[in-house]
Amino acid sequence: MSYTVIYAGTFDPITNGHLDIITRATKLFAKVIVAVAQNPTKQPLFSLSERTALVAQSCSHLTNVEAVSFSGLLADFARQHHAKALIRGIRGSDDIEYEIQLSQLNNKLADGLETVFLPPAVEWRYLSSTMIREIYYHQGQVNAFVPTAVVQALQNRKNNE
């Protein structure tokens, strides 16, 4: 399809689960904008510009992906970028009710904006950025769970502490 879609999140940091969803979305849609959100209610490990750069580096092999940072309403961002749909990953039943509510709200706010739900590959179903940060804070190894750019950024952060 020749549609632009948006996959939004804080991506703090981007994980292999996120990358799986992005890669699969690129096979379904002409352009995937990975919208890296500024969320004032969260204290991120990486700054907005760092997170956006990590997404861009991690997706550099995907020619139809663009990493863009944003703040404000996702519905407004989608309208500005002429997106036809949002991509959302659903790991399990815990995510479904919340994601359906978001989908309906964004549909109303952006006049018909659709949401496409993609479950992650089985090997990434349990994975979240929160878990990666926990492993990192406790000096664990995250190499198997995140793209190389994130491994390097975490190592650099650890070396500078």
From Swiss-Prot:
Assigned keywords, A-Z: ATP-binding, Coenzyme A biosynthesis, Cytoplasm, Magnesium, Nucleotide-binding, Nucleotidyltransferase, Transferase
Annotated site residue numbers, Transition state stabilizer: H18
Pathway info: Cofactor biosynthesis; coenzyme A biosynthesis; CoA from (R)-pantothenate: step 4/5
Subcellular location: Cytoplasm
Highest taxon, organism lineage: Bacteria
PANTHER family: PHOSPHOPANTETHEINE ADENYLYLTRANSFERASE
Quaternary state and interactors: Homohexamer.
Full protein name: Phosphopantetheine adenylyltransferase
Native source organism of the sequence: Haemophilus ducreyi (strain 35000HP / ATCC 700724)
Lineage, broadest ranks: Bacteria, Pseudomonadati, Pseudomonadota, Gammaproteobacteria, Pasteurellales
